[in-house]
Each structure stands twice: as structure tokens, then as C-alpha cells.
């Protein structure tokens, strides 16, 4: 899932993934303005959206739990890294499912809260790409982490949580207020 050369994450591979991700997200936003769904398809998309939220955010919460457990010295670094690596697939399947089903939910992109949610989704996706590169770097350090690396990990976790919870709250708000 990540481009490694001698245990070091390549900048070119990261840049390619970042550009491809931004292009995919921009395409999804554009498609959401072009597609019009039947009520049955809308309901199916909502179910997929909720299932993807459970899958992706649940996996993120598990990874973050192990990260906090490592900081509190309740679990070894190797176990935290193993969990983070193994949960990459459900995280990215969840994010992909959220974006794909979100296209079919006909978001009101003129609404400021919807625009904020889309910005949060872009931020959490780019933060997720950066988090993958970060865990590769941590693994390459062999368990010896300096303060800047620990600070980067904490910031990654905080950004992740803020984006996921923010997008979740806005989605709930928009749905209950029929925005």
C-alpha cells in the first residue's frame, strides 16, 4: 500500500498518491452535481454510507486506541504498528465507500456545512495518506522515536479525530435538518 525503497517512504510515490487522491475526490464532487438518484438508490447509498462509516471510522478508532495505549506504555510499539498496518485495508475501504456512496446522496454543495464536510473529508483523506507514510517512517526507526516524530504522530491522530468527528457531526446535522 505504500512505496518503500530500503525502508524509506519515497516522496515521488507519496506525491503520485496525493495527486491521484485529490483528482478522485474532485471527480466525486463533480459527479455528485451531475447524478440524480431514485429514492430507492438514495436509500441504498445511505445504507452503504453508514456501513462504510462503521468500517472506516471503527478501524481508525482501533488504530488510535493502540496509539494511545503505546503512549501510555500499555502496548509495545511493534504491536501498535502491526495493528495500524493490518487496519489500513478497512480504513481505506471505509473512506472509499463513504466517498462513492456520498456521490449518490446528492449533497447540496452550495450549503456551507456541506462544503465544510467535503473539506474535512479531503483533509482526513490526505492525513490518512500522510499517516501511512508516517507509520512506515516509525517502523524504519526501529522503535527509537525522537520528540518531533512523536509530535507528528500526535498531530496526525488529532487531525484524524477532528476530521472524522467533524464530518460525522455535519452528516448527522445535514440529514436531520434535510439540508
Predicted regions: what they are:
Residues 2-179:
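Polytopic transmembrane helical bundles with strong interfacial aromatic enrichment
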